[in-house]
Amino acid sequence: CPNKKIPSEFNAGLGMRTAIYVPFPQAVPNKPVIDKEHCTHYRNGKCGVCEKLCPTGAIRFGQEDRIITEEVGAIVVTTGFNVLNTDFFPEYGYGKYKDVITGLQFERLASASGPTFGEIRRPSDGQIPQKIVFVACAGSRDPAKGIPYCSKICCMYTAKHAMLYQHKVHGGESYVFYMDIRAGGKNYEEFVRRAIEEDGVNYVRGRVARIYEKNGKLIVKGVDTLLGASPVEIEADMVVLATAGVANKGAEELAQKMHISYDPYQFFAESHPKLKPVETNTAGIYL
């Protein structure tokens, strides 16, 4: 495919892909798909390289959409979720400073199949950050600017990311700004304690007020409420925002089509949180 500079959705924009691509390494089915929006053939009709070179003849640009009807015994709805856009937090500098990234982007950096093959490197210059700051609740529990609910997963994946950083960057310093640590699961509290006590992650209870760049460094300004709201200023090489989880676009429409319940935030609702946590109110449809 000649179109090789399309930002990769799976790598959260940190890498590039072609117009014909496998969505991600463990995709099921593990088959290539064509991005019609960026495919040169669909845009101007002047390309057809992949159709000519496909060894199995599986690509047919003239193929039209068709409706398929299948009878099944059960349906499992697994649509996942999205992360909240960070545009409403201009004081954090996301989109303005290349080294302010989201937790999902850090996850791809830490992955062996990611754009840096598992090495933690700054998007701006490819250097290894020696000091990193994680900002928890970047949008969660904030009715004024974000969403009112707790996303539930941010505390734990932030602790995991901080531990991964300490394991990969020996001698590096990591800081986590948090409101409260909500480690509600088996051995979750012990996991966070291990990050603090064994891996040396510095937890600061307080909100970040502003992030700006100075002399090639990111200046993170906040407060430490455990020290009487004392001002805290950290000169960091990279900042990671634990952005809030929100329902997928179109989740409400899908729920109405399938006649399943959903909450005010468009998340699908289970039949009973304790007795039937994976069943919906419609028989045969599961979450």
Roles of regions detected by a PLM:
Residues C1-L287:
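Residues forming the flavin
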